[in-house]
């Protein structure tokens, strides 16, 4: 396991709220339910370090405790389309295929109703 602290923020603006979780261990290790947290926010900016297992050839990815985007989408799959649209995947490793917005993986993410953040994204609060 990594020896680091994981921090997330709930940001409250005058009109909207944002959940900001740029780096977290697996969702099962968090004492809160990520789907509930997304529903309670206007925006959810969520850790997308890795898209799926096997992204780092030769590395045991179970030793790198970020939730895969595929795991996050599975955890949020029961949310309505309206709630899934609140999710913005952020903090992508250079190996993450979501960095290529034309990749098959990016198409899957968007087809399921989620968003992929890009440089310069601004969300009004």
Question: What is the predicted function of each stretch?
Answer:
Residues 6, 15-17, 24-121:
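Cap/insert and terminal regions of metallo-dependent hydrolase folds
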């Amino acid at each position: 396991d990594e020896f680091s602290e994981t921090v997330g923020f709930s940001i409250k603006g005058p009109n909207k709220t944002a959940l900001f979780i740029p780096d977290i261990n697996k969702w099962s290790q968090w004492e809160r339910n990520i789907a509930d947290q997304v529903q309670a926010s206007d925006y959810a900016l969520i850790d997308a370090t890795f898209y799926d297992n096997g992204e780092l050839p030769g590395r045991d990815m179970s030793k790198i405790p970020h939730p895969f985007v595929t795991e996050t989408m599975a955890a949020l799959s029961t949310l309505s389309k309206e709630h899934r649209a609140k999710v913005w995947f952020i903090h992508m490793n250079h190996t993450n295929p979501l960095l290529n917005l034309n990749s098959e993986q990016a198409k899957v993410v968007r087809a399921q109703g989620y968003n992929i953040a890009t440089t310069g994204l601004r969300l009004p609060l």
